[in-house]
Amino acid sequence: MFLNGISLRLTRRSGMWHLLLNMGPNSISIPLDSSSSIRRRPRWYSVRRHNQVLILHLVASSLHWLITIFPNTQQILCQTLPSLSIVSQDI
C-alpha cells in the first residue's frame, strides 16, 4: 500500500508480523506485538489521515493494532489491543 509518500507493507519474519514503512530515504520495521500466534496476515481495517498524522488500524483474529505515524518528525506509536467480544444475552 502506498499512502501520502509512505510505502506500507506487512511481512512475517522470525515468526512475527512486521509493518515495513518506507518514508523516502528511511525505512522502519515495526514488530506487531503478540502477533507470533497469528498465522494469517493482519488486515487493514481503516486508514485515516488527520492533518499530517496517519492512523492505521490493523486487525487479526483476536488482536487490533493502532499505529499512529507522524511523518514530519518520523515518530511512530504502536498500540496493541485485544479484540472485544460482544455477547448478547436473552433477558
From Swiss-Prot:
GO terms for biological process: viral process. It comes from the Viruses. This is Non-structural protein NS-S. Belongs to the orthobunyavirus NS-S protein family. It holds the Pfam family Bunya_NS-S. InterPro entries: Bunya_NSs.
